[in-house]
Amino acid sequence: MTKVGLRIDVDTFRGTREGVPRLLEILSKHNIQASIFFSVGPDNMGRHLWRLVKPQFLWKMLRSNAASLYGWDILLAGTAWPGKEIGHANADIIREAAKYHEVGLHAWDHHAWQARSGNWDRQTMIDDIARGLRTLEEIIGQPVTCSAAAGWRADQQVIEAKEAFHLRYNSDCRGAMPFRPLLESGNPGTAQIPVTLPTWDEVIGRDVKAEDFNGWLLNRILRDKGTPVYTIHAEVEGCAYQHNFVDLLKRAAQEGVTFCPLSELLSETLPLGQVVRGNIAGREGWLGCQQIAGSR
């Protein structure tokens, strides 16, 4: 039996309003619990369009057929008008998710975090995280115990900033296995549970065709030597590609693969490491990557 952490990122208003309810229904039918990370502030995701001037981002948008994958409402959100606030407008949906699944913070403003957090000072970062946590806690009526940095934009600055909130774990980076990042003080910080597997948009049209993706991914899962963690998006697997996700769950069950919330992957003893800036094939720009202590 292979156990895989299932992480669901919710980036947009439409993903919350339409994608999450569909995913909740699918997961219920398959008796699966997951970790769902919500963006709760303004939906300004359309402001990423300026990144089309970067060849790597343009190629990603073309090979993943972004217009049909996400929809024009997502691609244009917050461009010519202020982005709609996601959280309180979809509070009932978020509360429903929290009844059955582990719920954490993805971001206050997903676009702002992904585009600008790498240049923020620590207090600006702390204030932004606090705003998101406060909003999510108001919605679900209980403390938030986990978070996942938008776009995996995380480095030592993010690790230090999040220590102020005493969360149970964070999932801010890409890597191979859960670990504790070393702080500037030399002490181990809050546990990190890295994503180990590629997302749909990172590999479609580059490594694999859409119709072959599920078999390709299951092969990666079964060969994973670490602690497998897979991320889906409410805007993708909860909308245009929900049928592909259902097929993945059916095929996974046949292969003895089970999915669980990320917290079930934690153990009392974890290796030490760091989160450093790196690059992942198929994703434009830098992102946080796990580095085991002592390695370079």
Swiss-Prot record:
NCBIfam families: PRK15394.1
A Pfam entry, by short name: Polysacc_deac_1
Protein task: Catalyzes the deformylation of 4-deoxy-4-formamido-L-arabinose-phosphoundecaprenol to 4-amino-4-deoxy-L-arabinose-phosphoundecaprenol. The modified arabinose is attached to lipid A and is required for resistance to polymyxin and cationic antimicrobial peptides.
The EC number(s) this enzyme carries: 3.5.1.n3
UniProt GO molecular function: hydrolase activity, acting on carbon-nitrogen (but not peptide) bonds, in linear amides
Source species taxonomy: Bacteria, Pseudomonadati, Pseudomonadota, Gammaproteobacteria, Enterobacterales
Record-given protein name: Probable 4-deoxy-4-formamido-L-arabinose-phosphoundecaprenol deformylase ArnD
A cellular component term, taken from the record's GO annotations: membrane
Domain of life: Bacteria
The protein's enzyme class: hydrolase
CDD domains named in the record: CE4_ArnD (cd10939)
Catalysed reaction, written as an equation: 4-deoxy-4-formamido-alpha-L-arabinopyranosyl di-trans,octa-cis-undecaprenyl phosphate + H2O = 4-amino-4-deoxy-alpha-L-arabinopyranosyl di-trans,octa-cis-undecaprenyl phosphate + formate
